[in-house]
Amino acid sequence: MAKKSLIEREKKRQKLEKKYQDFRHSIKKKIKETSSLDEKWEFQKQLQALPRNSAPTRLHRRCFLTGRPRANYRDFGLSRHVLREMAHACFLPGVTKSSW
């Protein structure tokens, strides 16, 4: 189980990313559209003035149940440990153990 403080920190980052998402997207679009280096420089300054945690690259996928930050399956939102346990307990419909 991950520390609750780390899980809360990740939630805070998700809120910030959602809050500044449209503004960040519009600035990046303006940077691509302008040809003047001075204007690009000003837009880049605006982009750098945004909070660091509002960048989407700062987000990290975590397990829905345990909060584990590594070895997550996107399809289920679970870590490999929880996925294995739930698959063996038949809590995930359609998931079968492979056999060849």
UniProtKB/Swiss-Prot annotation:
Subcellular localization, as worded in the UniProt entry: Plastid, Chloroplast
InterPro entries the UniProt entry points to: Ribosomal_uS14 (IPR001209), Ribosomal_uS14_bac/plastid (IPR023036), Ribosomal_uS14_CS (IPR018271)
Ribosomal protein in keyword set: yes
Molecular function (Gene Ontology), one example: structural constituent of ribosome
Subunit composition and interactions: Part of the 30S ribosomal subunit.
NCBIfam families for this protein: PRK08881.1
Protein name (record): Small ribosomal subunit protein uS14c
Native organism: Physcomitrium patens (Spreading-leaved earth moss)
Organism lineage string: Eukaryota, Viridiplantae, Streptophyta, Embryophyta, Bryophyta
